[in-house]
UniProtKB/Swiss-Prot annotation:
Source species: Salinispora tropica (strain ATCC BAA-916 / DSM 44818 / JCM 13857 / NBRC 105044 / CNB-440)
Pfam families per the UniProt record, alphabetical: Ribosomal_L36
GO biological process: translation
GO molecular function: structural constituent of ribosome
Family: Belongs to the bacterial ribosomal protein bL36 family.
Any one cellular-component term (Gene Ontology): cytoplasm
Domain of life: Bacteria
Electron transport as UniProt keyword: no
Gene that encodes it: rpmJ
Keyword hit for Ribosomal protein: yes
Protein name: Large ribosomal subunit protein bL36
Keywords for this protein: Ribonucleoprotein, Ribosomal protein
Disulfide linkage: none
Length: 37
């Protein structure tokens, strides 16, 4: 899980979602997981 000030999709399988008021990226590739914070 990478924590970044701005999250972006890295590949086509990345999905940007909101969870508990946080913007997150979930993906089939675990290295692409990101959270805004």
């Amino acid at each position: 899980m990478k924590v970044k000030p701005s999250v972006k999709r890295i590949c086509n399988k990345c999905r940007v979602i909101r969870r508990h008021g946080r913007v997150m990226v979930i993906c089939a590739d675990p290295r692409h997981k990101q959270r805004q914070g």
